[in-house]
Swiss-Prot record:
Record-given protein name: Cilia- and flagella-associated protein 91
Renumbered residue ranges of the record's region Disordered: 94-116, 333-360, 690-709
Keywords tagged on the record: Cell projection, Cilium, Coiled coil, Cytoplasm, Cytoskeleton, Flagellum
GO biological process, one term: regulation of cilium beat frequency
Function: Axoneme-associated protein involved in flagellum motility and central pair positioning.
Gene null: resulting phenotype: Knockdown of CFAP91 does not affect the cell morphology and the flagella appears normal in number and length. However, flagella exhibit an abnormal axoneme with a rotated central pair complex (CPC) and an impaired flagellar motility.
Gene (UniProt): CFAP91
GO cellular component, one term: axoneme
Primary localisation category: cytoplasm
Family: Belongs to the CFAP91 family.
Subcellular localization(s) per the UniProt record: Cytoplasm, Cytoskeleton, Flagellum axoneme
Amino acid sequence: MYYRTQQKPASVLGANGFTAEVGGRDRVRYFRPPVEVAGVPMRYSGIDTVRFSATAPTTPNLPRTFAETRFDRPTSMAAGLVGPPHHLPSLPRRAGAAPPHPVKAKSVKLPPQRTKRVEKLASTIGTDGKCDAAMQTVFRENEAQTLPYTPNYYIPEGGDPNPQVLGLMELHWNEGLPAGKEEVELIQRLRRRRAVEASLLDETSKEAKMENFCKLYDLEVKEREEREQHFENLRKRRLDQIHEALQERERARDELNRQRLEKVKEQRLANLQRVIEQMESKRVGMGRKALAEQASKAPAAAGRGLYAVDPIETFKRKPDLIQTYARRGTGAVEPQLCTNNGGGSASASPRRDRSRKPLRNYRQYDIQPAMLKYEGGIAELEANKIPKIQQIAPNAFAAPENHAINSLPSLYQRREATRVVEALEYVHAKIHKSDTPAETIRVLELYRATPRPQRPDTPTLELEGDVNEAVEESCTLLQRLLRGRAVQNDFFDGKERCRGLIEELQAASNAKYAERSAEEKQAEAEEKMREAIADSIGNEAQGDIICDTLDYLFHEMTRQQDLLALEALRHEAEAVRAEREAREAELRAQERILHDKEAVQYAAYVRAIEDIVECYSHDLYATVAEECAMEEAIEAECQRLEQLPPPTSNILSDPEVAENLVCDVLDNFVLPAVIDMVRMKPEELDRKAPAAAAAGFRQRSPNEKETKE
């Protein structure tokens, strides 16, 4: 995309209470009236904060400056005092040049202080019109090299302590100087406001207040209108810049499209040339091969026998096989035109044998249509125009559906390809814009049709002494005209002399040609006639060659078009086949993924069933057997205890015996049973874990089926 350099906004007119920036390139280099920047203090003190450029420092308005300002008398402009006229330095004159006509200068009355200063300066000027001038610099080694330090300015006695020209001290080149039209208008507005505020009445009566209010109100209304006009100019300038930017962007875009189109055109032409060369080489090779096969199939002459040799063929120059294969057969054998397409038998008639001979004089036949030989046939052809040739059907170049773009895999690639195609169509429409019908006027065309803004007239500076300069310039111009006329006269004299010499040489040549004899003239006429006959024969031969070439090119073009159509059909069939193969591969991949998923689920289901069966069988074989053994042991012990006599009397009578009996029961029955239970608890958990996992799996499988459904 094309980017423009960021430009600084235009300056804004000064008004009440804000800083104004005045900038621009349409400024004049010098201006005569002084610039009043630091003026009288007023109620709107912010109006003095003015910058003459975007980079110029703002002139500070210190409170001390307002405190020291006095208004005992009006300013120089209000008092009507006019300073001395400003004269530009005169140009150096030649020693022998005549002095200009004296012009009566306008008399100016100067104050007594300035009269003394002028006399003092005149005394320093010598009688020869020269004077010495010194320059104060800041780069010096000691004070003896230059004049003593002097102040930058001085104020005469009785002068304004705060002259307006001091506002130019901090202005430099490209930082407020040189002043232009906008700066001058700003200075005039400042002076107008100062004049209005100086004319305000100091009385406190109602009439004085009303009069002051009317003056200030009119001034504010006028400044408001000027400010609105300035904003309107800024908007117009901005629109012009946008218009130029749009035009530049369109030009850059057209240039890029043109370059891209030229590049594509060169590439396509190079590819076409390469294909044409390949097809030409193949055609020549195939033609040579066909001629060789036809010659090999042709029967031998009956008079010479089967292995007879033609004496004429033996003396012919044999073709170089290496050179023939190096050139791919081009130019090795001239194509022969025969009336028959295949070989015949040896018993064919002589008429048929003569028909198989090549037609060596085929170029002498005129292939031009018979109707083009007389005027009536040409008129009839012009009257009966064939619509099929004269005009083309509107749907002949209908753009088919772009399969190349639609076959792209991603949407981003299709969008980018569509954008490129649209850009190429846009470039084609731009190139053939005159052939397309008139379209609706767009916004950019309206911008282009808009006339360019006219530059305002630059303010001119009229100084004293311009009349003398005009007289001097007119005299100089008159001298140049006189000298130029003299040089022009010399040029025309030389031209006339050359013309006379040329006429003399032509007359001598004509006389020499007239002195020749009749035999020489007749020989020259015969030579010209022979040249004309040779030119006519050459033109006729050239016409025959061009006609044959065009005929061959027409048939070759038809063949190339058929080949291109077949190639397009082949590409289309390959694209359809590739698309179908990709679709089938995608379906196969989905089926394979589903099959693998089902196989994994089935293996997990079988493994869970096997774990459940194993856990159940283990529980059946181990736990049930132990329980049965435990029950049998308990039952046997109970039966044994029933058979023993009751020891209750002995136990109750003897406490030591009872204690021993309890200890024996604990040692033999209780403690071993507890120890066995503690040791067998992990093994029991290991046995019951698969059953618990199988139960959880059975509970989770119905939930998953319900979520899938």
